[in-house]
Amino acid sequence: MNTATKRGAATHGQVARKLAGVDALEIKVTIPDNQIDAALNRYSLTVDNDEERYIYFFDTPNLDLFTAGMIARARRIVGEQDDSTVKFRPVVPNEVPTSWRKFAGFKLEADASETGVVKSASLTMPTGKGLINQVVAGKKTIAKLFTQEQEDFLASIGKQHIDYNNLSVLGPLQAHRWQFEDPACPWRITAELWKREDGARLMEISIKTPVIQAAAAIAGFMGFLAEVGAEQDLKQQTKTRWALQHYADLLRKKKI
């Protein structure tokens, strides 16, 4: 067996094995702040053609949930249905009970970035109009944002539960979201810009693809970004970590 054949045998099915059991793959790239304005201008992305969201996370000042692999989040979406999400990662797909697939808000997917592939399971449920604002104002408890199904989901997937009495509100993040197409990219592109109250920004560009297209999509999307001159953020922070660490720092400082 020659060298090329050995190399091919070693890598054959490598991506497919990493993604076994998930329904879809989202390939994400973080754009550094000094490239954000150029990206917005290139695709004419403005606050007039976006989907605007306000995102709140719920965790302890020490980010105990996040450290344990759990995320509790609520989104106020301008002009659309508000919702809340519980997510657990990483997961082993074949250990996730199939009974959760009956829920429209269930997702079993993988996120791919320069740092690797992470599989997650999440359950999103609608929330009542105005409920998020009431919780943030302290008029309702955080627990009111999450359903019994979401509680059962975390217990089933992560063998854990959330003590809402120990959680604080982290946020809001103001988010702008766009979907658009580029002739050079065969996949529909999503851009999301998050803004913190201190003025810091983080932009993520992503595509979603069926698992069967994963290997081609990963290589193709990275090649597309290089071709259009989109510089990747070498830190490759996830939006969630970037937001949580900032607001958790603020909480800890208030307690000093």
Show which residues each predicted segment covers:
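Phosphate-end processing signature that detects enzymes handling 5′-triphosphorylated RNA
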Residues: 2-256
